């Protein structure tokens, strides 16, 4: 089963487990770098929780996800269509003030991540910002019928080098540690500006 198949099959359960997750600190840190009413690409929108938050704060949001069932959940929640796209199929150009990739790029294989980062770089306006989070670690692993490509401060560096300038990088506790927890039970969070 691929990670996308997992989300398609378990979308309702995933919704219940994540819709009320407290990510206010992440929002606050990210939005410090996003202009008011700016345009945000919610890359890997999942159940739509984050898209709804940004829309309610006055931002223009384009949600995308590789899981058709997640796209349906997001579309129903926010009252507008989310796009059914894999990260590898994102081809926007100079359109976004920011990209929010919360707990989503962690399913992109290491050998494809640089290409996705290049697409994100192209999608952002000059000086646009990227937020991304990964399970904390340094290796690929299988958990709960999904594949995870964990990152730490050193392993993320070559994927953003020459594309993004790190503004903030921090480790945070995994508040849902029973859900495919990393061995370290932590997340790597990155906010970086397009170079």
List the predicted regions and their residue ranges.
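Conserved class I S-adenosyl-L-methionine
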Residues: 1-35, 37-46
